[in-house]
Amino acid sequence: MNKIGVLLMNLGGPERITDVGPFLYNLFSDPEIIRTPFPAFQKPLAWLISTLRSTTSQQAYLSIGGGSPIRRITEQQARELQSKLREKGLNATTYIAMRYWHPFTESAIADMKADCVDQIVVLPLYPHFSISTSGSSFRELKKLRDSDNDFKKIPMRCVRSWFSQSGYLKSMVELISQQISCCESPPNAHIFFTAHGVPKSYVEEAGDPYKQQIEDCSLLIINELEKYLGHSNPHTLSYQSRVGPVEWLKPYTEEVLADLGKSNVEDLIVVPISFVGEHIETLQEIDIEYKEIAEKAGIKNFRRVKALNTHPTFIEGLSDLVISCLEEPQVNIEEASKLPEKVKLYPQEKWQWGWNNSSEVWNGRVAMIVFLVLFIELIAGSGPLHRLGIL
């Protein structure tokens, strides 16, 4: 029987406070997260941003226990999925490839080669495809595969996105309905989807399908929820986690919460639609920051739906995805990592840089000026930004 390696790709996260700075450096070193006009500036800029953000990020992680649970939860998901696949008769072993923290993709590749797997199924733990999540992970995997002749010999199939998969939708409906049932008036409970945002330019200039997939997914969940409950609920979609000076996908979560409070919404069911495991965005940003905003806005009952984690229906759905991937026409790593024709990725290509209104990424000239000012102040330890309390 062929030995199947199932590669689960995820973001990764710092497990200890001392990991926060290096994790941020890895994150911002990715040109699909922060774009610069010149390759030589990528890592210095990543160092600068991670240095400036490290203290604030450390405080956020301290508020949830001192580190991210994403590795532990992903390992639990991997074990449960492996057991489920073996129950179904597959000789499958799961492996984890984190993009920005341990265990890195290189480690998973080494383990799969050592275990002599006969075939690999790549399953990103992102239901929706985005340039900056699944896209980045696929492209990293392809780069490593292209440079490793032994790894290149192993047949590989990929799942690109799976937001419409029945097991995923059913598990979301089950978790949402649990929170709705706790409300005094279940039909009036407001379903509030919040997805991780991306810069608007990713969609409008780069052709990222993420926004459309998120919108389609929220409607699929609402339709399935209505069938499950026998009644419809009002619902809203927003985008969270915006950083930096550029415009991100709207509406922003914090602004929608304020509007819902003005509309006298009392029971709010918060659904983290783009997250399949608990981590900093659910435990700190939603549970602490957004809950406080909602309460100040007058929302009395703020109920956050748990992330899927190892929900049995979800794990069943993941196993079905793996089996379908093996049975259906192959999607190879070249196809999976291919972005829409509109997309231009640095360093191979560049989105438009210059003094124009269409550029939603940092203008290269401004970015370099800011970088130099900040770099000089960090080295010197004094300057106008220090006097203003920014550094």
From Swiss-Prot:
What's its EC?
A: 4.98.1.1
Domain of life of the organism in this record? Bacteria
Q: Which UniProt keywords apply?
A: Cytoplasm, Heme biosynthesis, Iron, Lyase, Metal-binding, Porphyrin biosynthesis
Q: Which family does it belong to?
A: Belongs to the ferrochelatase family.
The UniProt catalytic activity note for this protein reads: heme b + 2 H(+) = protoporphyrin IX + Fe(2+)
* NCBIfam families linked to this entry: hemH
Q: What is the name listed in the Swiss-Prot or TrEMBL entry for this protein?
A: Ferrochelatase
Broad class of enzyme this protein falls into: lyase
Q: What is the organism of origin for this protein?
A: Prochlorococcus marinus (strain MIT 9312)
Cellular component GO terms held in the UniProt record: cytoplasm
Q: Which GO terms describe its biological process?
A: heme biosynthetic process
Role this protein plays: Catalyzes the ferrous insertion into protoporphyrin IX.
Per its UniProt record, what Gene3D superfamilies does this chain match? Answer: 3.40.50.1400
List localization entries.
Cytoplasm
Gene Ontology MF terms? ferrochelatase activity; metal ion binding
For this protein, the record's Pfam families field holds: Ferrochelatase
Q: Which residues bind Fe cation?
A: 196, 281
Q: In which pathway does it act?
A: Porphyrin-containing compound metabolism; protoheme biosynthesis; protoheme from protoporphyrin-IX: step 1/1
